[in-house]
A protein has these predicted regions:
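Outer-membrane beta-barrel translocator/receptor signature
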Residues: 156-159, 170-249, 253-259, 312, ...
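Short acidic/polar hinge/loop motifs at secondary-structure boundaries
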Residues: 117, 125-126, 142-165, 183-185
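C-terminal beta-signal and adjacent terminal beta-strands/loops
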Residues: 657-665, 682-728
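Structural signature of Gram-negative outer-membrane beta-barrels, strongest in the C-terminal barrel
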Residues: 252-254, 380, 399-411, 447-564, ...
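Membrane-embedded beta-barrel scaffold of Gram-negative outer-membrane proteins
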Residues: 319-321, 325-333, 337-345, 511, ...
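Acidic/polar loop-and-plug regions of large Gram-negative outer-membrane beta-barrel proteins
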Residues: 231-235, 248-254, 258-321, 339-380, ...
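Surface-exposed extracellular loop regions of Gram-negative outer-membrane beta-barrel proteins
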Residues: 271-284, 412-414, 502-546, 551-579, ...
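Gram-negative outer-membrane beta-barrel transporters
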Residues: 466, 561, 580-666, 723-727
Length: 728
């Protein structure tokens, strides 16, 4: 991630304790019953389409036992076996969350092939893959709009995370070339669950959480779920909190087997601050006569610095089977977010009198830095709705799973801000209190930005013997308006396509090839008032999947080539501005294996090679590597449960994560590679479980990113997490 220059919308809020309940996902596979065929008709009703996997009861949104999922929703918006999907996709299950001690969204994907989630930031969740950013969705609807007017996701509220690699606009509309990270919320399920969880960890972490679900009546027509989290914690950076309160209720009404309506709501309040300190190159990546800047150093002002956020969302998931062949679905969500963001950071401003360049540097004494200040009150509003009609047909020997859809969204952001000079600070011996905070009357309201998008899409999954073809077409219209700036308005439209073919060769092997496109309207203007052009991407991918029936194994290997136009990047000559590159060309190879083996072994293995270069540019950087992209990434996690039946007893696990060096955009500096180790030990006594996790057990000082504009960022140091879970 290229960390935006401090001062774009955002804000977390105060949060202390909390605990309650949650419920379990109960989405059932919709298998149409056989229907009589009409005599003499060339178009007959499809008997139950063979999209059902050997693992009975598994659905693309429900709980999975172990690490290996066999079905996914993200690639097709239909409940489809992974082996039939002509695109690489990974699923991280709830069981894997718990085994690896996941506490943030970025930790869910750290053992997933090709996605870089090492960025240590309390403000936002960000990911990179295949040389580009990754779009975030939740329950099939866009999750984020803007930058610092969003919240970080609480992983305890999630059932699973799906990562679809590469351009995916045919189904989702706006999206980047890196792929789509789709989060599946915990949903009500019929099987009763009562769970209470207590965590103690490094930096004074104290968290209590609860998850409850079950049926409210004997017929099972009404199901509920309640998830709650309360946390009081510090961080590895002095004076920065990580407090949170989350309450996420949901209610499902199923009057018949044909109809289901799930109401969802979420309230989240975070109280945090800036752990990204924008340190100079010297003292982090480059040597300093006073040594390395301590990772705990806080550049801002205690008592004033904050990133406080509040988020409220509500919506529904509706499904109704119109006939044995046709099903209507509609998903809707409304989100309201508010962020209060205040911080001081190492100054990027040039000073001709002292000779200071326009990047973070030490003063002449080599110890102090000049600081600038920013205060933002950011707000965001999102309204999203996706309506789908799915049908099952057969023409001759070819089975068709049709999907026609229309989605619409309106997203707005507002901001009031203040910027001003700060005071100097000795980073090796900080003394605070020299900065005088501004009053609220100094805040200046910025123009509101609104974006509307309307999309129509059509998809056909054709099955003929061992062959599966997926064909898709979509048209989008997007309009972005900035209040009081008609010249900055942008009307964008695009038609995107998708074609993929899979051949099931037997033994669980399935080679595939696919072509996909992406379209992402950016909206807004650069520092000089020029509207940003929409980003566009195209990808060709070929690979093979190995998902043998009856075995807990899921693996894939793929090669790909993609091109992206109009990518935004930092302007090294003006840290307040963003540039758009002409074209980026990326090619690479990825491989991943996830296995839940006999004798209670769970294993993940992942590798990715990414070669991303600027292929066309007017900025004089044609042929250079894309900044902040590692050519090589690899990881492996191995866990063994010593109990004979996988229930009760001791478990031991350990993992390694490698991220290769990254080009920073200048030959003056790079981001070094890192190799980190994690470990866990747990005891399961049936109703209760006690687990101890250690991340970065070698306590390595990691630099996750250095940028050409002059700053570097630290990663997370060693931390421990003790979790006690009781189910009753």
């Amino acid at each position: 991630m290229n960390y935006p220059f401090p001062g774009v919308p955002s804000r977390p809020s105060l949060a202390l304790l909390s605990a309650l309940a949650c419920l379990s996902l109960g989405t059932q596979a919709q298998t149409s019953p056989p229907a009589p065929s009409a005599d003499g008709s060339t178009e007959v009703m499809l008997a139950p389409v063979t999209v059902q996997d050997s693992l009975a009861g598994e659905t693309a949104t429900g709980p999975v036992s172990g690490f290996v999922a066999r079905r996914a929703l993200s690639a097709t918006k239909t409940d489809t076996p992974l082996i039939e999907t002509p695109q690489s996709i990974s699923v991280v299950t709830r069981d894997q969350f718990e085994a690896q001690g996941v506490t943030t969204l970025r930790e869910t994907t750290r053992y997933t092939a090709g996605i870089n989630s090492s960025y240590f930031d309390n403000r936002v969740d960000s990911f990179k893959a295949r040389g580009g950013d990754v779009s975030q969705y939740q329950d099939g609807l866009l999750r984020t709009y803007g930058t610092y007017n969003n919240i970080k996701v609480e992983p305890y509220t999630l059932e699973r995370v799906e990562f679809l690699r590469g351009p995916s606009s045919v189904l989702y509309g706006q999206g980047s070339v890196g792929g789509v990270l789709n989060l599946t919320s915990k949903r009500p399920q019929a099987e009763r669950l009562r769970e209470v969880q207590i965590q103690l960890g490094s930096h004074g972490r104290k968290q209590i959480a609860s998850d409850m679900t079950g049926s409210m009546d004997e017929e099972g027509k009404w199901l509920y779920r309640l998830v709650a989290v309360g946390r009081d914690s510090n961080t590895q950076v002095d004076h920065v909190k990580d407090d949170r309160v989350v309450i996420a209720p949901s209610l499902t009404y199923r009057p018949s087997t044909d109809t289901s309506l799930t109401l969802q709501a979420l309230y989240q309040k975070d109280k945090s601050g800036s752990i990204t300190q924008f340190f100079p190159w010297q003292g982090t990546r480059l040597p300093s006569p006073y040594g390395q800047i301590p990772t705990r150093t806080f550049i801002s002002e205690p008592g004033w610095d904050k990133y406080d956020s509040e988020n409220k969302s509500f919506g529904y998931l509706f499904s109704h089977r119109l006939s044995p062949q046709w099903t209507l679905r509609q998903n809707l969500r409304r989100t309201i977010s508010e962020v209060d963001y205040r911080t001081l950071y190492t100054s990027f401003a040039a000073n001709a009198a002292t000779g200071r360049p326009a990047r973070p540097v030490f003063d002449a004494n080599g110890r102090t830095v000049q600081r600038d200040a920013v205060w933002q009150i950011n707000g965001g509003r999102m309204l999203l709705v996706d309506t789908q009609l799915e049908g099952l047909l057969q023409t001759g020997e070819v089975q068709h799973q049709l999907l026609a859809g229309m989605d619409w969204q309106r997203n707005t952001s507002n901001q009031s801000n203040w910027r001003g000079p700060g005071t100097a600070l000795d980073v090796y011996n900080p003394v605070y209190g020299t900065f005088t905070p501004p009053s609220a009357s100094r805040l200046v309201r910025a123009p509101n930005v609104a974006q509307r998008q309307l999309g129509f899409y059509l998809q056909d999954q054709l099955r003929w013997g061992p062959w599966t073809a997926t064909v898709g077409l979509r048209h989008d219209k997007a309009k972005t308006e900035t209040e009081g700036r008609p010249a900055a308005a942008a009307d964008d439209s695009a038609t995107t396509k998708r074609l993929g073919v899979t051949y099931q060769a037997g033994g669980g092997w399935a080679p595939y090839v696919s072509y996909t496109e992406s379209f992402q309207p950016l909206g807004g203007v650069d520092f000089y008032g020029t509207p940003f052009k929409p980003q566009r991407g195209k990808q060709l991918e070929a690979g093979v999947k190995w998902i043998p029936e009856g075995k807990g194994i899921s693996g894939y290997a793929a090669v790909y080539g993609l091109r992206e136009q109009n990518r935004k990047t930092n302007d090294p000559g003006n840290p307040l501005n963003s540039l758009q590159l002409g074209e980026v060309k990326t090619q690479g190879f990825e491989a991943e294996l996830i296995a839940s083996l006999a004798r209670n072994w769970d294993w993940t293995l992942a590798y990715a090679y990414t070669d991303a270069k600027i292929s066309r540019s007017n900025a004089g950087d044609q042929g250079q590597r894309v900044a902040s992209v590692s050519r090589h990434m690899a990881s492996s996690w191995l866990m063994h449960r010593f109990a004979a039946q996988g229930r009760g007893g001791w478990s031991l696990g350990a993992g390694l994560r490698y991220i290769g060096p990254q080009w920073s955009g200048t030959s003056a500096i790079d981001t070094p590679s890192s190799l980190l180790a994690d470990a866990m030990v747990a005891y399961d006594a049936g109703d209760w479980r006690l687990a101890l996790h250690a991340n970065n057990i070698g306590d390595k000082v990691v630099i996750t990113q250095c940028l050409s504009r002059g700053d570097c960022f630290y990663g997370e140091r060693r931390n421990f997490l003790l979790t006690a879970t009781y189910r009753y």
